[in-house]
Structures are given as C-alpha cells and as structure tokens.
Amino acid sequence: MKQRLIFVAWNQISRRSAELSKRLGAEYINLGRVDRPTLKRLFNLVVNFFRTYSLFRDRRPEVIFTFHAHPLITLAAAIYKKFNRCQVVADLHSAAYLDHYRFPLKSLNRWVWKKADILLIHNRMSQNYFNQNIPGYSGKLFVLEDPIPAVPVHIRKKYLYGVKGKFVGILVSRFSDDEPVLPFLEQIKEVNNIYIYVTGNYTKARITPDQAEGENYRLTGFLDDDKYWELLAGADFIIALTTREYTLLSAGYEALALEKPLLISDTDTLREYFQENVEYLDRLTGDIGKSMENVIVDLDDYQRNMSQLKQVKNAEWDTKITGLINKIV
C-alpha cells in the first residue's frame, strides 16, 4: 500500500496489532499501559492520549489504526481526523463493548465509533453481539480474525527437561481474571503421564514461589519471545483457558501456527472458529484428565486437523485482508 499507515496500541503485548501492522505495511507504535494503581492508570491514559495525538501530527498518516480497548485512543484519532484528511479504523478489543461500554465511557465510545470509518471486530460471534446490543453500526463492522502468526525461522523443537517419559503440554496464560489456571492445576494433580508448563507472569495471581512448581507442572514466569516459541515448539500439545465469550485466544492462533494439537475452553466463540478440530475443555466441569488422554491417544489426528485448518484459515484471512485494503485505498 502506498498510503501512510500508522497502527497505535496502548498495551503491554499485542501480537495481533504487531502482526496486522506487518501485513498492512503500517508503522506500529505501542505506547504501553499501566494497570495499577488506579490513579497511575488514569494518569497514563491521559499521557498516552497526548502522546498519540502528537504522533499523528508528526507522522501525518492517511490511515490510522487504533487498538481500541479504551475509547481515548480512538478519540485522539477522531480529533486528528476532524482537522486533517485521513481515515480511522478502530480495531475493537472485546473490552471496548463488554467492559468499557457503560457510564461514563458509553457515550464517548458511541461518539468515536460514529466518527471512525471502519470498526474491526475479531469474530462473527462478536459481530452478532454488537449488532444485537449496540445497534446503529452494522455498516461499519468488518470481521477480521487475528492473522496466524509467523513462527520465527530460527525456532527449533527443543527438548524440555524434567519430563522424560511424559507428554508435555503448554498452558499459555496471562493470569487474567477469566483464566481459571489454579483450578486447572488442582485438577491435573492426579494425571500421571503428563507434564504442564504454564507461561505468564504468575505474580499477578499472588502465587508464592513454593507454588510455582508441582509434581507435574511448572510455572515459567514471563518468557522472551524466542524462549516462548521454543517452549511451544517442544510441546506435544497446547492449552488455552478462558471463561469469557466473544474472544479468540492468542494461544489458539499460535497452536495453528505450529500445527500443534489444542485443548481449549468450550465457548460458542471458540467452537465457531475451531469447529471439531480441537479438544474442548468444558469450563472445568468435565474430566480434564480424560480430555488430555483424548488428545494424547490421537495426537497425529489432531495435528493433521490443525495443519488442514491452518491452510483454510490462512486462505480466509488473505481474502478478508484484501477486502479491508480495498475499503481503505
């Protein structure tokens, strides 16, 4: 694309934003965020607002993409658009319409969505929710799932120590409130033939160092990108947990990238995307050990399913991104 594109995010890590920027040829700028304490978070939001507007004035983009969880990021784009010729594409995180769509942010969200040219939404279930609960924007909604990430070329399958004779699973986590990691670990204590690595900064869950390793699991803490991909590449299967609807999990896309068997929470949104190609965990009400056994017994079949699904989803995504580009050029 010959237009000047910029993609701005305010978060800690957003593989979606980074990957989407690459595919679009957009300059990607992530200003970060602060979650706690509340006063510091509010101050950070205000600072990021002015930094973002200043970026727009310096770069003079023709198309602005915002990773829209909080409305202030797209407000900066909407104000810039008022005085400059450009298009605004708000990439809506589910928090935008599930967590921040209430007083006092509801009216601000509606105003900036009205000013935006396109509202990217991450899956069809979210599109249905949006149309049913927030009417008036159906003409602006464009469904675009995450691109399946490219695995770094230097990443090789790595032997995972301490797990001889066991099948290895990687539970990908950020220890968010919607991820029932601790109940999961409690339930796998009786499963003898598996070993689980759990990624992510577990200090957010107030886990003590003595709880960071058990007989058949180990919490890795936060890993840099290379070590993270090496861990995933060395696993027999990948696990992703959520109790939250209307979200597709990064771990699911990463499992597709590596063509790894996937155990994932059973939500309508995830079922709509992955169909019958993965093993579903019934929100921890079912038999976790049995679900793992199902994958272990049919590892080759699940891997073949993921390989085929990857081809289908890549082709679908290529068609969608072409459609998006045609809308903004």
Locations of the language-model features?
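Acidic donor-binding loop of glycosyltransferase active sites
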Residues: A233-T247
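Short hydrophobic beta-strand element within catalytic cores of glycosyltransferases
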Residues: F237, P261-I264
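Conserved donor-binding/catalytic core segment of Leloir-type glycosyltransferases
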Residues: L160-E179, Y197
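A short, active-site helix/loop in glycosyltransferases that binds the activated sugar's phosphate group
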Residues: K114-L141, I148-A150, I207
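A charged, aromatic-enriched C-terminal amphipathic alpha-helix characteristic of glycosyltransferases
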Residues: V297-I328
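Nucleotide-activated donor-binding/catalytic signature segment of Leloir-type glycosyltransferases, i.e.
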Residues: R206-D226
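A short, histidine- and acid-enriched strand-loop-helix "catalytic/donor-clamping" loop
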Residues: R36-P37, C86-F103, D117-I118, V151
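Membrane-proximal helix-turn-helix segments that form the acceptor-binding/catalytic region
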Residues: Y53, I79-F83, R102-I121
